Amino acid sequence: MYPFGVHAVMLRRPVSVIELPGYRQRADELLGAAEQDAIVDLIAYEPTCGDLIPGTGGLRKVRVGRRGSGKRGGARVIYYFYNAAFPLLLVALYAKNEKADLSAAEKKKFAALVKEITDQWRKK
């Protein structure tokens, strides 16, 4: 499932997943219900499957296929996984034909968002 040299942690119990509003809106625009469910299942059971994105405070990016596009021309899911006790956050989603990577401004914005959410979570 993963290229040589890539290791992912597969959990016996899925991590709780929270879809942030920006992700939810784009998921409804780009993906069908079955594709959305498959993404949640993949990431909930294999939360380290995505590549870490430098400069984002720990966000990860994973490629997913879309109807008629396949994995290479599909979509990219941006998410945050801290640990199995912390809910996994689905942060953003975009089609590969829209852009290749997050801009520096997006990275900064998402890093601040993740920091704010994790700081609030730790206060509980």
Labelled PLM ranges:
Residues 1-34, 119:
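Arg/Lys-rich, positively charged N-terminal/basic patches that mediate binding to nucleic acids
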Residues 19, 39, 56-60:
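A generic structural signal for short beta-strands and their flanking turns/coil linkers
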Residues 49-93, 98:
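Basic/aromatic recognition patch in beta-strand/loop cores that engages polyanionic ligands
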Residues 4-9, 13, 81-124:
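Enriched for short, Lys/Arg-rich terminal
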Residues 33-36, 72, 107, 111:
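Amphipathic alpha-helical transducer elements in NTP-driven molecular machines
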Residues 22, 31-51:
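Compact soluble domain cores
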Residues 26, 42, 113-116:
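Residues that form generic nucleotide/phosphate-binding pockets
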